[in-house]
């Protein structure tokens, strides 16, 4: 089993067949809808809120609303659908969440997407929730995770998941690997590679994305969609407190299993950090799309599929070559 991560890999260019990168198509079909980019903001409180969810849906980007305002989920679905927008929500696996799914069916409030969102998704509780959703609201596109093994992907798919989310603790504000000794931190791209070979349905790569080039690498190794946390945090539109430190503006960014999200110091597997303010989210999305178009042109194609076929080399932590401060 080859073990590598994002910084260990460079993709090998092919002959370019376009006159301009603007000819390259970054759209992706994911479930019942098509989206401008194969990228989704992490369903975290410091990355996604209702205002941003609305903006993403209006502009043909995929989003997943976090699950930390449980009472607000049904009103959120109704509001989005009244505006002619798709609804994409998260659920956990506690007993009350099974009742919540039944209430969606009873009230005929059916979101287009539901993400079952727990840290260790290869579990009986997630399998039971997948089956529960498919029994009561079978038309919903169900994303389940997170897993880090081919066995996990297969079991969730066999239970009825329409997509699986791969990544155990590789994110910047996740400390699972330190607290538990388990995870895909440091070999997330390799884990994605192995999981995608077992998958029959789409995979979301979740965690460890530090640069726009990592998005192209995720697609090369089997992702249909790439979940991004820290790169989407700390924008003008982002949730979270803004602070000034040494004359620079920063925004808070914390993990979904941190004490700042939980409100208590118990079973903590996340931390809080401050990320330098990045300006407009629209500008970041535009740059992300342009960089991905460039990636497609280097791959020798016109769409995302060309990225899946390119060769790669393993270069062991040398891609930055002194060009980038790795503390960023």
Curated annotation (Swiss-Prot):
Keyword annotations from UniProtKB, A to Z: NADP, Oxidoreductase
What EC number(s) does this enzyme carry?
1.7.1.7
List the InterPro entries hit by this protein, alphabetically: Aldolase_TIM, GMP_reductase, GuaC_type_2, IMP_DH/GMP_Rdtase_CS, IMP_DH_GMPRt
Q: Does the keyword Secreted apply?
A: no
GO terms, molecular function: GMP reductase activity
Which residues catalyse the reaction?
A: 174 (thioimidate intermediate)
Q: What class of enzyme is it?
A: oxidoreductase
Residues annotated for NADP(+) binding in this entry: 203-226
- Catalytic activity field: IMP + NH4(+) + NADP(+) = GMP + NADPH + 2 H(+)
Q: Name one GO biological process term.
A: purine nucleotide metabolic process
Q: Which residues cross the membrane?
A: none
Q: Does the entry feature the keyword Phosphoprotein, yes or no?
A: no
The disulfide bridges present are none
Q: Which GO terms describe its cellular component?
A: cytosol; GMP reductase complex
Membership in a protein family: Belongs to the IMPDH/GMPR family. GuaC type 2 subfamily.
HAMAP family from the entry? GMP_reduct_type2 (MF_01511)
Q: What exactly does this protein do?
A: Catalyzes the irreversible NADPH-dependent deamination of GMP to IMP. It functions in the conversion of nucleobase, nucleoside and nucleotide derivatives of G to A nucleotides, and in maintaining the intracellular balance of A and G nucleotides.
Please identify the protein, giving its name as recorded: GMP reductase
Q: Which organism is it from?
A: Staphylococcus saprophyticus subsp. saprophyticus (strain ATCC 15305 / DSM 20229 / NCIMB 8711 / NCTC 7292 / S-41)
Lineage, broadest ranks = Bacteria, Bacillati, Bacillota, Bacilli, Bacillales
């Amino acid at each position: 089993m080859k073990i590598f991560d994002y910084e260990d890999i460079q993709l090998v260019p092919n002959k370019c067949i376009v006159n301009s990168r603007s000819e390259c198509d970054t759209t992706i079909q994911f479930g019942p809808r098509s989206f401008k980019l194969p990228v989704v903001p992490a369903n975290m409180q410091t990355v996604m809120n209702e205002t941003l969810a609305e903006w993403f849906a209006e502009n043909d980007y995929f989003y997943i609303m976090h699950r930390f305002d449980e009472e607000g989920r049904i009103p959120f679905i109704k509001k989005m659908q009244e505006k002619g927008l798709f609804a994409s929500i998260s659920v956990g696996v506690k007993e009350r969440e099974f009742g919540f799914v039944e209430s969606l069916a009873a009230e005929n409030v059916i979101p287009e997407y539901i993400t079952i969102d727990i840290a260790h998704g290869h579990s009986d509780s997630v399998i039971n929730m997948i089956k529960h959703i498919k029994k009561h609201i079978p038309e919903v596109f169900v994303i389940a995770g997170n897993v880090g093994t081919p066995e996990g992907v297969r079991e969730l798919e066999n239970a009825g998941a329409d997509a699986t989310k791969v990544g155990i603790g590789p994110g910047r504000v996740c400390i699972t690997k330190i607290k538990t000794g388990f995870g895909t931190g440091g070999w997330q791209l390799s884990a994605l590679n192995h999981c995608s070979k077992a998958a029959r349905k789409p995979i979301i790569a979740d965690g460890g994305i530090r640069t726009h080039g990592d998005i192209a690498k995720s697609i090369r190794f089997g992702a249909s969609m790439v979940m991004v946390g820290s790169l989407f945090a700390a924008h003008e539109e982002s949730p979270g407190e803004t602070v000034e430190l040494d004359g620079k503006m920063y925004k808070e960014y914390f993990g979904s299993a941190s004490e700042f999200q939980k409100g208590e110091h118990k079973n903590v597997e996340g931390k809080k950090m401050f990320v330098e303010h990045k300006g407009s989210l629209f500008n970041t999305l535009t740059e992300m799309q342009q960089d991905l178009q460039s990636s497609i042109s280097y791959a020798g194609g016109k769409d995302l599929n060309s990225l899946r076929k390119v060769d790669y080399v393993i270069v062991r932590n040398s891609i930055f070559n002194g060009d980038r401060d790795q503390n960023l």
